[in-house]
Design a protein with these regions (language model features):
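Conserved, structured C-terminal
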Residues: 1-247
Length: 247
């Protein structure tokens, strides 16, 4: 990706840090380039000025330059964004989700004096959590699970139970087969008491992915990201420094 972007906008893009921005020109079209993405890989996004006028002109230039780099026009690999612990709006989280229920607690600052939308509610939620009384019963976790390789988008949320024959206690939101880890990985919602890595659960997969149709597969809660990202986002960087929660 870097070599292609150098061809398009010049060597300056090589020095662009994660989440950095660079003004450039592609085929006469003004753009902003960012080193961001939806997969944990080292990738770039191009923002085009006056896109309704110049989209095809810029896009065709990208395709032409990409021929020398075996460029393929595809969406980010779903399993890579799951492996990176990147959440999908509407699939993993929604307007009712608190950052503290997911891996987004680092986005809620402790020392910010300025007002922002939701500040009072978020600070109250954090105080309750630190007092041992979280204002929620479910949290999002990473899971490694058995079954046949999951190779398509889940059309529904698959249920999670504590025992193979038990009642559902949670559900999977984003599952996929990870070729790097050689196992199915997923993100899902489970009761707070099962959030720690090593917790053993069961996932009720559809027949095409179950080892035995009608029977659940074993799963274990794991830390996220599932593997270190080539281009870690701010959440992953702070977590490695022991700052998973904001200061």
């Amino acid at each position: 990706s870097q070599a292609l972007m150098v061809d398009l906008v010049g060597e300056a893009v090589s020095e662009l840090p994660s989440y950095g921005l660079l003004a450039g020109v592609i085929n006469g079209c003004d753009v902003i380039v960012s080193q961001t993405g939806f997969s944990g890989e080292k990738g770039y996004e191009i923002y085009l000025y006056d896109a309704t006028l110049h989209a095809e002109k810029m896009w065709n230039a990208v395709l032409e330059a990409g021929k020398a780099h075996q460029l393929m026009v595809v969406a980010p690999a779903h399993h890579r964004r799951i492996a990176a612990g990147i959440l999908s709006w509407g699939q993993d989280i929604d307007v009712e989700t608190l950052p503290f229920q997911t891996n987004l607690a680092y986005q809620v600052p402790r020392a910010k004096e300025a007002h922002y939308i939701g500040k009072q509610a978020l600070e109250a939620a954090r105080e309750a959590i630190e007092a041992g009384n979280p204002p929620f019963s479910m949290v999002m976790v990473g899971l490694k699970l058995g079954g046949q390789p999951i190779t398509d988008y889940a059309p529904d949320f698959w249920l999670i139970s504590k025992t193979s024959a038990g009642e559902p206690v949670g559900y999977v939101t984003s599952p996929w087969w990870s070729p790097e880890l050689e196992t199915n990985i997923a993100m899902g919602w489970v009761p707070v008491q099962y959030k720690e890595p090593g917790a053993e659960l069961w996932v009720h997969l559809p027949a095409e992915y179950a080892d035995i149709p009608g029977s659940p597969v074993a799963a274990v809660v794991v830390d996220t990201p599932f593997r270190e990202s080539v281009n870690p986002n701010q959440r992953e960087i702070l977590k490695k420094k022991g700052l998973a929660a904001a200061v």
